[in-house]
Structure formats: structure tokens, C-alpha cells
């Protein structure tokens, strides 16, 4: 980004923040009687926050709240011009339906304790935007009620803040920890992709990324951890951390998926995505804070804190591994049917451009290849990664669907028989 643009965006961000400060809902009043980390969900998923649509005034209030929590924990600001905010344009060729304007990642650093390793970092992140009043990504078409996004993803932000609390109270890890609340995830991983291109700590000195997305419904079920095949050491580290907290885990697979870890795996970092599975309230107005498993949320945060501390304190870097096998999922229903396409985040005017397909996948069998742009699947137009995810979720394994592609400027249709992840 050019310096002039960066300064302009920063100035606009600070001005908007100052202008909206008095209008933001009173966090103390909203969270009275609710203990952290659930109190963070209680605030972020309150009706007064209007669903935290990326770039909206209510999302700015959410960002201000998160920055205040970082400040209270003693974390250093790592955004623009000495602030906690990293401004970015939300208008995107990847998603022509994005709200536009300027969004903000909220970025803070817990400095590492070892002078020789403090210049290296581990990222712990969670997106804080949601759907506002619904729109095209809602699973309740035509319902313009507030979509509060308690599990998706106020829960991830709350868990991230609890991880920060646990690590800040000491002993501090050897490496630094970068905590990031991402904007624009629902619009196509905009915030995480921008940060990956403009990192507070260079990515060649960033050792791993831990993503928390939808971690508020643990209940009796296992904690799902995607991405354990992205480093040789992950499985043992995750199993050890979970066992110490009495949490059952299930997972595996590579680092590609419909959440922010993808932006970092695509750039060669080991990643994990912590997840407590999909549910009937996903992308609906009914995803409210009262349904969050408070005890489970704390246990997830405890597991992630152990993993983060382990990665940040180990003498050697992780052994990165780009998994060849399809991503594993604990439940075939979690992300719908499986195609096996690998997205390329290079902006295109419309659709989802692919960097490749997985060997033996339905995509490969259908003749889809690197460089293709998916613009339609079945009856659904595909404008962006979220649209592709929604199209897959609308189908079940075994469905045979026409897929419209753009290849070398030509429009063509192939037919794919969708499979199951890991099958």
C-alpha cells in the first residue's frame, strides 16, 4: 500500500472512531452480571451491535471494544500509526457485493520473552464481522432481522481474548504472539488476506497461525481441529493440549477452508482452525449469545492457549507440510458436499479462481483445473468464496451438478459428482 493511501485510511479510521465513540453501546451495562469470556460474546452479539456488518458503524464499535480489551491486557498496538487498527479497503474484485468503504483489523502484540526469538511470532486470530441484517449470505432468505452472530464469530473473538489473558498473565512465551480480530471474513477473507500482505511481523518470521471460528457450541461433542496435517508436530501438540484440559478432539486435513487460516496456509504457514461444528442457527437470526456453552468456550480457549504457548516456546520452527490428501472433516455435514477445488485469492472480476484441484477429487474427475474460474454451481451463482461454500452446502454428497467455468476467456460447463471430505 502506498504511504499516502495508508495515512488517508488511518486518518479516516481514527476520525470515524472518534465520531462514533459516544454512539457506541455501553459495554458495562450490556455485560453486567456476565463473566468473561462469555461477557465478550454478550456484548458483541447484542442487538445494539446490529450484526457487525463489515465496514458498518456497529462493526466499528465492536472493533473499539476489542481494542479496549487488548489495551486492558497490556498488549502493544500493532496497527497503523501506533494504533490497534489496521485499515483496509473493503471494496473487492473477489466480492462485488462487499459493503465497500474502509474496514479495520484490530491488531495487538504480546512481546516474546526471549530476545533471540521475540522477533518471530505466532498469530492467534478470529474474525469479528458478521452479516448485519442478513443479506445474500443468510440461511434465512428474506429475513431482515438482526443476525447477531454469537457463535459466528463473537465466540471466536471471546476465546481469542481469553487466550490473550492467559498468555499475558505469564510466563510469557519466548516468541511474540500477534492477536488479530479480522474484518471482512464473511465477504471473502478480506481482512486476513490484507493482513497477510501487510503483516505486523513479516510472514517469513511468523511461525504459525491459529484461527478460532465458531467455537461456542462445544457441549458434549469434540473440539474439531482442521489443519493438523500442515505441520508434522501438530497432532501431538494438539492431543497433548486437549488431554491436559480434558477435551476430546477430532480433526486433520490441510489448511484450506472457508475461514481465515486459508489466507496464511496459501502463503506457506502451518495453520490450525479450531471449530465446534456447524448447527441449525448458522447464518440465521437465531445465533444468539444465550446458546453459547460458556464452560466449553473457556475450555477451548485453554486448549488454544496451550498450543500457542507450545509453538511460541519451542526452540525450532514447525515442520511445514502441504498435505496432499483432501481435508478431513469430523462430519460430512459440517461444510456440505466436497468438490476438491483449491482457491486462488488473486482478485478476479467475478467467481472463484482456482490455483489447483486435489488429486482424485470430484473436481479433477470433472476436468476442472488450475486457472479455471467457477461462476455457477447447479442453480446458484458463485460470485466469491462464500458463494462457492454456500453452493456446496446446498448439495449433498453424491449429487451430480453442472458447474459453469471461465477458462481462457471461454465459458464452459462440466459435470461433477460431489463427494465427501476425506472420502
Report the location of each language-model feature.
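C-terminal recognition in membrane/secretory proteostasis and scaffolding
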Residues: 303, 312-423
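Second-shell loop/turn segments in exported
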Residues: 24-31, 47-57, 95-96, 141-153, ...
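A non-catalytic alpha/beta surface segment that caps or lines the substrate-entry region
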Residues: 52-111
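Alpha-helical metal-binding/catalytic segments enriched in His/Glu/Asp
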Residues: 108, 124-130, 135-189, 304
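N-terminal hydrophobic or amphipathic helices/low-complexity stretches enriched
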Residues: 21-77, 119
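His/Asp/Glu-rich mid-to-C-terminal helical/loop segments that flank catalytic regions of hydrolases
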Residues: 280-324
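Acidic/His- and Gly-rich active-site-bordering loop/insert found
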Residues: 44, 70, 88-93, 100-138
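Metal-dependent peptidase/peptidase-like ectodomains
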Residues: 172, 182-279, 293, 297
